[in-house]
């Protein structure tokens, strides 16, 4: 990846986001070639961080996440843990969810999805991290 200028530029773009390191950027580039080409709903479903409902008739089931690309979910989990503490945008988002009574794991998965959507938009628009526009 370091030898190819296109991949190197994409990795630097992804790493411009706070708390997104080399491992996260490399995994996203290698495992998700669709990054920057899909909308936020489709990229979230592809990775497996979009909630799916289990409704039938009048029964309203739980919303769960499943499927997707396990390696990407693993690195997003670690990046979201770090971003939850150090990224002001993700921290404010998580605090809002916790204030509404959401559980810690639910909040963390929502942070994973938020981080993925931000990174997808950054790649799509070819812009570096800007906390005001994120």
Language model features with spans:
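A detector of single, family-specific signature residues
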Residues: 1-134
């Amino acid at each position: 990846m370091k030898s190819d200028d296109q991949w190197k530029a994409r990795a630097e773009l992804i790493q411009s986001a706070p708390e997104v390191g080399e491992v996260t950027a490399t995994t996203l580039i290698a495992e998700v070639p669709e990054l920057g080409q899909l909308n936020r709903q489709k990229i979230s479903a592809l990775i497996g961080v979009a909630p799916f409902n289990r409704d039938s008739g009048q029964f309203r089931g739980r919303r769960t996440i499943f499927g997707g690309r396990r390696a990407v979910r693993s690195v997003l989990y670690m990046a979201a843990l770090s971003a939850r503490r150090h990224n002001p945008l993700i921290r404010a988002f998580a605090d809002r969810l916790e204030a509404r009574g959401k559980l810690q794991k639910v909040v963390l998965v929502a942070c994973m999805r938020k981080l993925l959507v931000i990174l997808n938009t950054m790649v799509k628009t070819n812009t570096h991290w800007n906390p005001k526009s994120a």
